[in-house]
């Protein structure tokens, strides 16, 4: 009985003396985990984008930047990282680097679709914001690790910023595409038409008869030369010129017996003379 009680007492004493293991994760590790989750959300949004409204991608990018900036504050306000803490960051940072590279490659492959939606400039600005946030986080973590590991920490984080810089370079030429369509298509059209026509006509009429019949001569000539030149240009200028010349000449010549009155008078005079001559001849 006493022996059993002693064992129980020893057991309780041993249990109380054994330290309880409490899981302690460095704040920086939790920060990387949160950033990784939000990077996955951005990757999903980019993967689903096939043109049109890019708001889902923009929203995911803004949340990622917000998460990174929040992580920067957490690391800065947290304790210094031990060697074990720094080494614990190696694998998560490497995994995050691969995620970021995948998102950037997907963004680059869909550049034409974002530009077509006039969102190239938006993606460009989002990438710059991601770069600034990631660089701030890298500096914050490097400042917390032991000095002997600061170079290693910088090299690990450099992979993330290098991937983002690749995206920035790819979208740099689309920086001006920010939701407004711009197109320029100069066109110049020139047409020249020249039409020249010349018409010349001469008409001559001649009529001749005995002296008691009127004689008339008529001649006429006409010449017309229209010229038209038109040069239309898309800019809105045009010129035209036209000219025409016409000449007509007519002349009529009539002898002294060209009228009916003169012919009648001459006829009467001749008839009267003949009658008188006949009367004299009969009288003789």
Curated annotation (Swiss-Prot):
UniProt modification remark: Galactomannoprotein, glycosylated.
InterPro entries: Cell_wall_mannoprotein_1
Industrial and biotechnological uses noted in the record: May be useful for serodiagnosis in patients with aspergilloma or invasive aspergillosis.
Keyword terms, alphabetized: Cell wall, Lipid-binding, Secreted, Signal
Keyword Signal: yes
Biased composition (Low complexity): 176-234
Annotated spans, Disordered: 176-252
Compartment(s): Secreted, Cell wall
Gene Ontology molecular functions: lipid binding
GO cellular component, one term: fungal-type cell wall
Leader sequence residues: 1-17
UniProt similarity note: Belongs to the cell wall mannoprotein 1 family.
Biological role stated in the UniProt entry: Constitutive protein of the cell wall. Antigen target of host humoral immune response.
Name of the protein this chain belongs to: Cell wall mannoprotein 1
Organism annotation: Aspergillus fumigatus (Neosartorya fumigata)
């Amino acid at each position: 009985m006493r022996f059993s009680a002693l064992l129980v007492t020893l057991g309780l004493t041993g249990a109380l003396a054994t330290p309880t293991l409490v899981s302690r994760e460095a704040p920086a590790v939790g920060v990387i985990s949160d950033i990784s989750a939000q990077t996955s959300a951005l990757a999903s949004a980019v993967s689903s984008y096939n043109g049109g409204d890019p708001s889902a991608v923009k929203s995911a990018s803004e949340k990622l930047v917000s998460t990174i900036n929040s992580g920067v504050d957490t690391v800065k306000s947290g304790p210094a990282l031990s060697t074990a803490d720094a080494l614990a960051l190696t694998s998560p940072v490497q995994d995050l680097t691969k995620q970021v590279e995948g998102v950037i490659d997907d963004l680059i492959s869909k550049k034409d679709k974002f530009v077509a939606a006039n969102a190239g400039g938006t993606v460009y600005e989002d990438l710059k914001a991601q770069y600034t946030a990631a660089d701030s986080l890298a500096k914050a973590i490097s400042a917390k690790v032991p000095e002997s590991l600061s170079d290693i920490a910088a090299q690990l984080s450099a992979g993330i910023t290098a991937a983002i810089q690749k995206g920035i370079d790819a979208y740099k030429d689309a920086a001006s595409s920010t939701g407004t369509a711009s197109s320029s298509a100069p066109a110049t059209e020139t047409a020249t038409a020249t039409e020249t026509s010349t018409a010349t006509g001469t008409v001559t009429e001649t009529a001749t008869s005995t002296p008691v019949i009127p004689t008339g001569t008529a001649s006429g000539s006409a010449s017309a030369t229209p010229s038209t030149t038109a040069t239309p240009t898309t800019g809105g200028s045009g010129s035209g010129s036209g000219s025409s010349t016409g000449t007509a000449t007519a002349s009529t010549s009539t002898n002294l017996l060209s009228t009916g009155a003169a012919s009648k008078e001459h006829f009467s005079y001749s008839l009267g003379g003949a009658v008188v001559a006949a009367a004299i001849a009969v009288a003789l």
